[in-house]
């Protein structure tokens, strides 16, 4: 085969074997040209002898050769190779491997499918189809569309076909195994531009029915849409899915919908239950939905008990929230979780930093990364779950497998990192490097060794050897991946990692360069970016890898939060996903149930069958290979056996979990070991791309030549020309095959040489060695007559060759081949994954019928979820908690009475309505809503009553009268800006409005104006007969009634009847122009349009007129004057020319009526009128006459007693309020010099609770406390860190920030000790660490004690965090137990020890405690002033100062608070301080008296206060508002309640500055808390009997007024608006008293800041007044309505059996006995016994309670403070610490020798010594350096172990150990 073919017989391109080309054509260029010539005639393949195949991707069909058949096609060649391998498998019993090499897009996946289908077609078992389905599922889950191909593999595949050895010729397929290596997880959340994520996600989106989409939540318009229209299932391609790349990627020529049906079918064929398939689809939907979650920063305005921190936190800390709650609820439903807990889990992440669990509060970007991590984890676990289940269904028992065929296909070489994951790129390239190295070994080294042993000499061939790169990357122990893993495990930094790489590889390995030299900036300096990178010279080119983020990525840590969250899932499937072996967990060493973190294994779950076998049959050897070193944890590969996985975990306990690189490395080693096995025969398929642009049938010589060079094809071809040996046969076997017998005489070697001479095989294909014969595969086949053997090919339907057989791809396309699932009638089938016209592939035509899918319609066509729970049901199930009864509670009488009132007020609202519309599933939450609603009703009623009293009450008591006295009428004369009014017959009209409309308009307005303010009755004579019907129904028209004005003092100025203008209005009968109804019509019109009121006559004035002989009286409030009538003012007159009729009756009024006015003038005649003996008709007629002729006005009652009462009642209330304001003002004016107190000798504790504040805030607060002008020796700074939490914007946990400020090094790590906390259930057990020392700042040296709440080991999320109240309780409970000499918890005993023995002060000495928030800065003299005031008045139990704002001008929100802060302190608190009862001592700046000065009786820490304040069961609305909203106010309430004889005071001279909320949402939340807690606390105070004062001057009355004013705050603004509107409508009556009161309130406030010279407050006051609507209306109403907005926790009270009230919780039941307690004396005695130490020398008791082990760092002299302890003048503490350092050291050594329980075991030390020596430079390493390194690793002093360390080191070095 070496020689060239005879010229002219066949064209050059017909030669398929490259080694057969002439020697001068063996260069890269010539071989490329030869490949091109074949490519252009439709022959895209070539061979490297029988061992390798070269295939060029045509980007068209891979199954059509030049003549249209498969001959010459890639598929044909693949089938041929498979047939040869299968033959060899049967004939020689060798394991076979087909290894694919090539770049992404070269067609490896397609050819792999052809090879697999060929192998499966050789077997007739039903297993063949199962294996094809399994392969399809693997591809569906792990392939994607990249820039270079539609089917890019993104996971390494080791596909194993298992055969038994019963038949020597045609082995039987008995099983298979899919071993996946390292899925590219990063692609899930980071889809590169122009590429897709994994195909299955697109299948799901496209292939589900409308009903299924609805169930999965795909039909919601929740996703960002690029088109404005509504999203329908048809427009699904236009939705923007974050995890699916650009919307254009949804349509790329892949039939996704069909792919989904095939995916479901494949799962069904592999016996996955329908319900499980539906669950799988739900989980895939979850992944898509997680991508859609939108995060934003918000405030945790829902109050929870765990909140902590200062004023700026009170409105709710900044948290990350999910904006699209509907998407979140879909995710929660499918995962079986509660919506709130899932949302909460995104906003934080728990990490382990320096062996401490820390919760990091995440911003929206961090939450997005957290969500991405969740998506990656779920997808990885789902893939692992599906593949493991597939393997369970296809894998044969290991001991029955005789031989295997392995198909190895790893992703192609990656020059750039497309998904942003350096780790994925590095591991993928490392695998490619390893496989290529194996290829080179197979062709070169492996054969060379054996040829040398057999004394066969062949010419050497030079080739590019990539061993340096392989060794540099993959060497066990000190290869790059091993170092990466080791550095990750040890928690090294990136800089340390870079340094390690430099030490290892610089000038030692040419393939790896650390800190690429090329990246300089012209200055000669290497850039930071270049320094943090390394370059690997791969066989396919150099690649730069960034170190940035690599260590963290390699850890691939799944936080414990996620694991614990998934523990609570209600979904069995999700529980199963997170319970599989693919998920490795790390548990806490002390609490095995607590999962610290987890990791999705980067190792496959299964091992190849060959790797599990201890030895191979010797007789079947081919070429010997250097045996691969057995990896240490070979057996525990992926935790395949329970025993081994357990072993691995125990090994990890010391070193931590193996990283991705370490796992991948060990799995690669196993692959390499299997492939390098002597009993395995490898084949290689080199897949090449003809061009880089995916253009069909175009050959780019440059592109192909580069690939030919990369893979060293020319060198391999040359090597095969020299030595193409594939089989080695010992002489006996060779001769047996050659059937030589005894014909030839001689030795076996001579006989063999004779046979070779006869065969005339070329020398490079057949050679005789010293013990056997080397043959090429062709020669062996010829010899063994393999061609005579028939390899059967089976078809799925049993049809002939022409039919479409199972996995027998005839017309499949490249990149689109392999796939067809349904019958061949559909020409477009198979495009679902590979595009193009393919027709055949994974599945045979008959395999897809419905024979095994009985009732399969639900799966394939309808709704696969119809038998599952709905999303709503799942969500409800996920929100439920597992509860257990933990306690029984009595219900108080007051509670029962209150609930009766609540139900009375809310009975009409049915419970189901609250459940349905309010979405309140829990009964206690619904009850709280009812309470809230009842309280709101009461408040609204109070407001309504207040409004009623202000507005409606005066009107009811004294109805408004529109009457004008004579003087008032006269004042409306149109002069000096007054209106113009005029009166006619007792009715007042608006002359101003009338004048412009006066007819005729010739009369000038000035003439009319002179009548203003006058009675114009005289101008309008009346026709009596038209206005009155008389006694009998008619009056003669000639009868006239004269009008006589009443000119008496007090009556209106009247116009004479002789006025010039009177004649124009005279239309009486006797005039020539008679219009009897004119006056009535005019009056009607005037009343309708211009009426202003009536002339008013007071009862007194009517009496006065009567005395002056006026016949005047009132009936029903109307005043009638009959004087003129009675005095004879009646006459008759007829028109000119007519006579007055005789006997005209001028007496038209009934005598009885007249007599009333004659006999009873000046009186109210209403009763007499009613009693008149006249008929109804007469009464009506007389009433008409009175109204029309004698009416002069109405009775004016404005000065009556009832009206006076109404007026002065409101005034009295106003004056009372004003008096309170004046009192407050007087209280605020506390002038006098600010005397600077003298030095004081009282011991004080300065307490700062820290939560998630930043370093600047903490440093400011602590420094201000330390720098207070108070004797440093007598103050103790106590910082209580509430949980291991990294706040947003912080780079370290808060405790670490605090310790760094105080100067405590990280090496100091005390033991966490138990103590009781405030929490639900088991959360009552908490653990804390105690640190103490000295803090030096600006010349002050202050002792400090830091309490760090770290939580129990089982706490994963927010470990230790229990809230601000709990932080206060830590110190309160400790001091309480100190003063009452009660048993203490371990942590409290440690606190006692640290304070007494380390700091040197007995804890009972401390008399005062100053509580300051972490965002508050105190003035230097404030502490001294507080103590001085408390000494001056020993009855003071609590005292607060004035708090100002440090961020006054930061935002509009802070600006409106400045004045309010000033006034609330200087008015309200100062006023309350007068009574000695400040009702709210703010927690941000208050000093409390710990014990009384005289009797030492505990006050602040008395039993009653501590017990009440440590209430754990906070389950009612009232208790929630007291303890979760306003714990500071409630603490004050408790002090007033339990110590009524003591005072709480305000001291304006003591100053502090805090931070006010800057955003409106936080401000709103903070004020909601304050207002609601105020209401509930004042309700608590009102019943107290002991509040000082008497009657209205009592504090109780003030409390009631305060409560009322809080409730009816909105009314005050409403009243001001009412006054303004009143003024706008009617400025004539100004409510002066109201304005005087308002002016007094604000005027007095202004005086305060004027007297205080706070001139800037004038501006702030204006800002405040503009914000009045917010403070007076918006805040109260918002607060009252949101009174029940809490995070309710999971503990609740329910009605149990027999009506008992029982508490249930999901936190478990707390057993107080789980925390051991001892009195200090007992504890000290135990220490004394243990150490034989004298009691007065108890400093030595540096034993922690938990372990009795000594902590050297905690000794008086050794504790690292912010300055060296030796400079500290100990004696001035008056302490007993006089122990000499030398004695201390010797005692220290003695103690260590006595108790070594905390030291590591000898085995652990030995393991670490081996590890150190394995990587150490033996030329420089010393025993001392080894001991120091061990101490650093274990974190303890190992002096006691020095002899063992020295001996063990020597033993390891000498090989004895």
Swiss-Prot record:
Any GO molecular function: chitin synthase activity
Principal subcellular localisation of the protein: membrane
Keyword terms of this UniProt record: Actin-binding, ATP-binding, Cell membrane, Glycoprotein, Glycosyltransferase, Membrane, Motor protein, Myosin, Nucleotide-binding, Transferase, Transmembrane, Transmembrane helix
Domain Myosin motor: 1-788
UniProt key word Membrane: yes
Transmembrane segments: 898-918, 937-957, 1209-1229, 1603-1623, 1630-1650, 1657-1677
Induction text: Expression is induced in YPAD liquid condition but not in the solid phase condition.
Membrane disposition: Multi-pass membrane protein
Residues annotated as domain DEK-C: 1799-1854
Transmembrane among keywords: yes
Segments forming domain Cytochrome b5 heme-binding: 961-1020
Binding, ATP: 102-109
Enzyme class: transferase
Domain of life, per lineage: Eukaryota
Enzyme Commission code(s) on record: 2.4.1.16
A matching Pfam family: Chitin_synth_2
A biological-process GO annotation: chitin biosynthetic process
Localization per record: Cell membrane; Cell septum; Cell tip
Role summary: Polymerizes chitin, a structural polymer of the cell wall and septum, by transferring the sugar moiety of UDP-GlcNAc to the non-reducing end of the growing chitin polymer. Specifically involved in hyphal elongation and new cell wall formation.
Domain observations: The N-terminal myosin motor-like domain (MMD) does not seem to have motor activity but is indispensable for polarized cell wall synthesis via binding to actin that ensures the proper localization to the hyphal tips and septation sites near actin structures.
Protein name: Chitin synthase Y
Species this protein is from: Aspergillus oryzae (strain ATCC 42149 / RIB 40) (Yellow koji mold)
Gene that encodes the chain: chsY
């Amino acid at each position: 085969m070496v020689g060239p073919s005879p010229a002219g017989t066949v064209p050059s391109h017909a030669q398929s074997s490259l080694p057969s080309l002439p020697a001068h054509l063996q260069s890269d260029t010539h071989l490329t040209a030869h490949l091109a010539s074949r490519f252009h005639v439709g022959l895209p393949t070539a061979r490297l002898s029988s061992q390798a195949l070269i295939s060029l991707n045509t980007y068209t069909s891979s199954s059509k050769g030049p003549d249209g058949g498969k001959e010459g096609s890639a598929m044909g060649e693949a089938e041929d190779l498979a047939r040869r391998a299968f033959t060899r498998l049967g004939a020689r019993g060798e394991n076979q491997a087909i290894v694919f090499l090539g770049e992404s897009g070269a067609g490896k996946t397609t050819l792999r499918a052809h090879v697999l289908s060929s192998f499966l077609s050789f077997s007739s078992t039903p297993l063949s189809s199962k294996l094809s389905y399994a392969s399809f599922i693997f591809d569906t889950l792990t392939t994607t569309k990249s820039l270079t191909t539609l089917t890019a593999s993104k996971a390494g595949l080791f596909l194993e076909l298992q055969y038994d050895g019963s038949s020597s010729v045609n082995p039987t397929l008995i099983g298979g195994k899919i071993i996946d290596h390292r899925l590219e997880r990063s692609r899930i959340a980071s889809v590169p531009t122009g590429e897709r994520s994994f195909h299955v996600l697109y299948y799901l989106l496209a292939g589900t029915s409308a009903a299924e989409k609805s169930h999965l939540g795909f039909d919601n318009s929740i996703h960002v849409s690029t088109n404005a229209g509504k999203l329908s299932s048809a427009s699904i391609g236009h939705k923007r899915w974050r995890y699916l790349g650009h919307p254009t990627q949804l349509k790329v020529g892949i039939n996704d919908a069909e792919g989904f049906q095939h995916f479901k079918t494949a799962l069904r064929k592999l016996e996955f239950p329908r319900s499980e398939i539906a669950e799988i689809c739900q989980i895939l939907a979850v992944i898509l939905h997680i991508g859609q979650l939108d995060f934003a920063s918000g405030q945790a305005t829902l109050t929870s008990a765990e909140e902590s921190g200062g004023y700026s936190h009170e409105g709710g800390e900044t948290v990350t929230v999910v904006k699209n709650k509907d998407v979140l609820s879909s995710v929660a439903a499918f995962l079986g979780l509660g919506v709130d807990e899932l949302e909460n889990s995104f906003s934080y992440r728990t990490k382990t930093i320096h062996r401490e669990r820390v919760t990091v509060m995440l911003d929206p970007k961090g939450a997005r990364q957290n969500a991405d991590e969740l998506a990656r984890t779920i997808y990885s676990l789902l893939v692992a779950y599906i593949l493991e289940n597939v393997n369970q269904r296809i894998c044969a028992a290991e001991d029955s497998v005789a031989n295997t065929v392995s198909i190895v296909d790893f992703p192609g070489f990656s020059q750039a990192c497309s998904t942003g994951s350096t780790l994925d790129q590095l591991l993928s390239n490392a695998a490619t490097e390893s496989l290529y190295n194996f290829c080179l070994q197979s062709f070169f080294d492996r054969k060379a060794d054996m040829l040398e042993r057999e004394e066969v000499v062949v010419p050497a061939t030079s080739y590019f050897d990539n061993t340096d790169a392989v060794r540099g990357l993959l060497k066990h122990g000190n290869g790059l991946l091993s170092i990466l893993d080791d550095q990750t495990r040890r928690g090294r930094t990136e800089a340390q990692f870079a340094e390690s790489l430099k030490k290892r590889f610089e000038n030692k390995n040419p393939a790896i360069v650390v800190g690429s030299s090329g990246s300089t900036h012209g200055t000669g300096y290497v850039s930071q970016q270049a320094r943090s990178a390394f370059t690997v010279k791969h066989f396919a080119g150099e690649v730069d890898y960034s170190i940035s983020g690599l260590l963290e990525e390699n850890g691939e840590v799944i936080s414990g939060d996620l694991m614990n969250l998934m523990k609570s899932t209600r979904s069995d499937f999700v529980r199963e996903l997170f319970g599989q072996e693919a998920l490795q967990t790390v548990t806490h060493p002390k609490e095995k149930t607590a999962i610290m973190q987890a990791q999705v294994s980067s190792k496959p779950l299964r091992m190849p069958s060959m790797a599990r076998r201890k030895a191979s049959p010797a007789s079947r050897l081919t070429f010997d290979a250097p045996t691969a070193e057995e990896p240490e944890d070979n057996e525990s590969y992926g935790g395949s056996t329970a025993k081994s996985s357990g072993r691995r975990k125990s090994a990890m306990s010391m070193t931590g979990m193996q990283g991705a690189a370490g796992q991948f490395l060990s799995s690669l080693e196993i692959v390499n070991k299997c492939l390098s096995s002597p009993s395995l025969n490898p084949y290689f398929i080199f897949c090449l791309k003809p061009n880089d642009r995916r253009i069909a049938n175009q050959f780019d010589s440059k592109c192909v030549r580069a690939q030919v060079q990369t893979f060293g094809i020319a060198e391999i071809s040359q090597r095969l020309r020299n030595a193409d040996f594939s089989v080695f046969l010992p002489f006996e076997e060779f001769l047996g095959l050659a059937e030589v017998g005894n014909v030839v005489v001689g030795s076996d070697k001579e006989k063999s040489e004779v046979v070779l001479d006869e065969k005339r095989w070329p020398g490079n294909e057949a050679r005789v060695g010293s013990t056997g014969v080397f043959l090429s595969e062709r020669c062996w086949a010829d010899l063994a007559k393999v061609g005579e053997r028939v390899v059967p090919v089976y078809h799925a339907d049993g049809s002939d060759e022409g039919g479409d057989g199972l996995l027998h791809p005839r017309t499949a396309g490249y990149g689109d081949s392999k796939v067809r699932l349904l019958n061949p009638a559909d020409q477009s089938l198979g495009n679902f994954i590979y595009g193009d016209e393919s027709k055949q592939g994974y599945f045979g035509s008959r395999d897809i019928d419905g024979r095994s899918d009985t009732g399969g319609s639900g799966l394939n066509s309808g709704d696969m979820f119809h038998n599952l729970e709905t999303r709503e049901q799942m969500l409800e199930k996920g929100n439920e908690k597992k509860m257990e009864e933990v306690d029984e509670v009595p219900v108080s009488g007051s509670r029962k009475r209150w609930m009766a009132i609540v139900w009375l007020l809310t009975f009409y609202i049915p419970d189901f309505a609250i459940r349905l519309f309010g979405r309140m599933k829990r009964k206690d939450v619904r009850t709280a809503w009812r309470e809230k609603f009842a309280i709101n009703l009461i408040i609204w009623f109070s407001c309504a009553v207040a409004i009623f009293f202000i507005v409606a009450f005066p009107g009811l008591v004294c109805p408004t009268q529109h009457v004008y006295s004579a003087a008032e009428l006269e004042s409306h004369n149109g002069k000096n800006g007054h209106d113009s009014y005029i009166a006619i017959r007792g009715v007042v009209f608006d002359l101003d409005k009338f004048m412009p409309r006066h007819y005729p308009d010739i009369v000038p307005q000035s003439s009319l104006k002179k009548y203003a303010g006058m009675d114009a009755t005289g101008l309008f004579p009346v026709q009596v007969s038209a206005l009155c019907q008389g006694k009998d129904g008619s009056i003669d028209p000639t009868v006239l009634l004269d009008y006589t004005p009443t000119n008496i003092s007090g009556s209106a100025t009247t116009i004479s009847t002789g006025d010039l203008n009177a004649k124009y209005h005279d239309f009486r009968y006797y005039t020539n122009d008679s219009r009897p109804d004119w006056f009535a019509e005019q009056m009607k019109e005037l009343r309708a349009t211009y009426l202003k009121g009536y002339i008013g006559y007071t009862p007194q004035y009517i009496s006065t007129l009567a005395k002056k002989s006026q016949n005047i009286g009132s009936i029903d409030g109307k005043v009638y004057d009959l004087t003129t009538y009675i005095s004879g003012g009646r006459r008759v007159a007829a028109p000119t020319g007519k006579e007055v009729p005789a006997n005209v009756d001028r007496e038209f009024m009934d005598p009885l009526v007249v007599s009333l006015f004659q006999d009873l003038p000046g009186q109210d005649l209403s009763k007499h009128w009613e009693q008149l003996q006249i008929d109804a008709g007469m009464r009506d007629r007389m009433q008409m006459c009175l109204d029309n002729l004698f009416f002069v006005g109405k009775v004016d009652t404005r000065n009556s007693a009832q009206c006076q009462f109404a007026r002065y009642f409101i005034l009295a209330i106003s004056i009372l309020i004003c008096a309170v304001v004046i009192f407050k003002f007087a209280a605020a004016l506390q002038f006098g010099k600010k005397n600077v107190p003298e030095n004081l000798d009282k011991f004080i504790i300065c307490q700062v609770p820290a939560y998630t504040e930043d370093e600047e805030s903490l440093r400011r607060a602590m420094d201000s406390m330390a720098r207070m002008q108070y004797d440093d020796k007598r103050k103790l700074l106590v910082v209580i860190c509430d949980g291991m939490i990294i706040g947003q914007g912080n780079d370290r946990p808060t405790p670490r920030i605090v310790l760094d400020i105080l100067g405590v090094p990280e090496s100091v790590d005390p033991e966490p000790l138990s103590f009781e906390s405030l929490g639900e259930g088991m959360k009552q057990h908490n653990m804390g660490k105690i640190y103490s020392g000295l803090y030096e700042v600006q010349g002050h040296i202050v002792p400090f004690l830091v309490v760090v709440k770290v939580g129990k080991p089982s706490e994963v999320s927010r470990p230790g965090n229990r809230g601000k109240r709990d932080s206060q309780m830590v110190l309160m409970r400790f001091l309480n137990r100190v003063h009452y000499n009660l048993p203490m918890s371990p942590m409290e005993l440690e606190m006692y020890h640290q304070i007494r023995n380390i700091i040197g002060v007995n804890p009972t000495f401390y008399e005062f405690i100053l509580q300051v928030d972490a965002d508050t800065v105190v003035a230097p003299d404030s502490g001294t002033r507080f103590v001085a005031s408390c000494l001056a008045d020993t009855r003071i139990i609590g005292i607060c100062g004035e708090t100002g704002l440090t961020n006054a001008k930061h935002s509009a929100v802070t600006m409106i608070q400045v004045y309010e802060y000033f006034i609330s302190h200087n008015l309200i608190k100062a006023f309350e301080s007068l009574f000695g009862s400040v009702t709210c001592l703010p927690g941000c700046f208050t000093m409390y008296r710990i014990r009384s000065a005289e009797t030492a009786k505990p006050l602040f820490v008395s039993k009653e206060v501590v017990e009440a304040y440590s209430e754990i069961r906070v389950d009612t609305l009232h208790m929630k508002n007291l303890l979760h909203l306003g714990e500071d106010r409630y603490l004050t309430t408790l002090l007033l309640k339990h110590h009524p004889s003591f005072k709480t005071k305000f001291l304006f001279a003591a100053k502090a500055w805090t931070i006010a909320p800057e955003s409106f949402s936080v401000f709103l939340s903070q004020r909601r808390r304050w207002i609601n807690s105020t209401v509930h606390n004042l309700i608590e105070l009102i019943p107290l009997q002991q509040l000082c004062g008497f009657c209205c001057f009592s504090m109780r009355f003030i409390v009631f007024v305060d409560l009322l004013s809080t409730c009816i705050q909105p009314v005050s603004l409403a009243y001001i608006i009412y006054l303004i509107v009143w003024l706008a409508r009617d400025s004539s009556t100004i409510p002066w008293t109201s304005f005087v009161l308002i002016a007094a309130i604000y005027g007095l406030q202004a005086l305060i800041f004027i007297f205080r010279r706070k001139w800037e407050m004038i501006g702030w006051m204006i800002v405040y007044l503009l914000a009045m609507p917010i403070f007076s209306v918006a805040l109260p109403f918002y607060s009252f309505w949101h009174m029940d907005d809490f995070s309710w926790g999971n503990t609740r009270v329910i009605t149990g059996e027999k009506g008992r009230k029982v508490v249930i919780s999901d936190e478990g039941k707390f057993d107080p006995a789980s925390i051991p307690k001892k009195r200090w004396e007992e504890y000290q005695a135990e220490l004394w016994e243990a150490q034989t130490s004298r009691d007065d020398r108890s400093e030595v008791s540096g034993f922690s309670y938990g372990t009795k082990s000594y902590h050297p760092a905690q000794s008086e002299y050794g504790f690292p403070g912010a300055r060296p302890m030796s400079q500290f003048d100990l004696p001035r503490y008056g302490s007993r610490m006089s122990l000499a350092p030398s004695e201390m050291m010797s005692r220290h050594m003695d103690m260590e020798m006595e108790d070594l329980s905390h030291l590591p075991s000898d085995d652990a030390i030995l393991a670490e010594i081996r590890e150190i020596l394995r990587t150490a430079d033996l030329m420089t390493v010393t025993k001392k350096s080894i001991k120091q390194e061990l101490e650093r690793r274990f974190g303890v002093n190992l002096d006691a172990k020095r002899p063992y360390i020295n001996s063990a080191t020597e033993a390891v070095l000498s090989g004895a150990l």
